[in-house]
A protein has these predicted regions:
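Internal glycine-rich alpha/beta core junctions
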Residues: 1-96
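Glycine-rich cofactor/substrate-binding loops
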Residues: 67-214
Length: 214
């Protein structure tokens, strides 16, 4: 009458399933929170004065109380912190039930408030993050800075191998050039490998996302 697919025949099994759905949900939203936390941490790192890869407008950042030039990524720091709390939820649930015998226990009532609160929090974090990330400003020509020239060393090594060098000889040549300060990186590469910087396959990723959400 209630539309369930089947009946749970064993009462003990039914009782022992209490809290398992909440744990599954905690793991799922914890996984999502992990992605948001790392993304936010990367943003905070890339905004540092030493890197300065990206920036955000004043509406997304706050000023420092003592440093007039500083723009703090408070939004992303708070998302990171909140998402780290959400990731700890499964540990809380495990500890709540760690010494319970089979059967019903009132302790499991404590799951309810925490799971509802965490779902609200992760939805808020997603909404705030999606709004904020659309305001991102990426500094152009970052790799023109001389301090990043060595990021091309592997590409240049691979090009030598493709031209007929053995890997060892190509490695030694690039290494010697770097040691002797003779290394001049070639920066114009045309990548075609799926997923590479020259072929990100964004359309394919979008299709996969739509399939997952539908």
């Amino acid at each position: 009458e209630l539309g369930f697919n089947e009946l749970k025949y064993n009462v003990i099994s039914s009782q022992m399933n209490r809290g398992k759905v909440e744990k599954s949900v905690a793991i799922a939203i914890g996984s999502l929170a992990s992605t948001l936390s790392k993304f936010s941490a990367d943003i905070c790192f890339y905004m540092t004065q030493e890197l300065n890869f990206i920036s955000f407008p004043d509406e997304i950042t706050t000023g420092s109380s003592i440093m007039p030039h500083k723009k703090n990524p408070d939004v992303f720091e708070l998302i990171r912190g909140k998402c780290n709390i959400i990731q700890s939820l499964i540990s809380e649930f495990n500890y709540i039930s760690i010494n319970l015998t089979s059967g019903y226990h009132r302790d499991l009532q404590l799951y309810k408030g925490k799971i509802i609160e965490s779902i609200i929090d992760i939805k808020n974090c997603l909404e705030i993050f999606n709004y904020s990330i659309n305001k991102i400003k990426i500094r152009k020509n970052i790799l023109d800075d001389d301090k990043y020239k060595y990021v091309f060393s592997v590409e240049n090594l691979n090009e030598l191998v493709n031209s007929g060098y053995s890997f060892r000889d190509a490695y030694l040549k690039i290494s010697d050039d770097i040691k002797n300060d003779n290394y001049i990186p070639k920066k114009d590469f045309n990548h075609t490998l799926k997923g590479s910087i020259g072929n990100l396959c964004l359309k394919e990723i979008e299709i996969k996302m739509k399939k997952a959400f539908n």
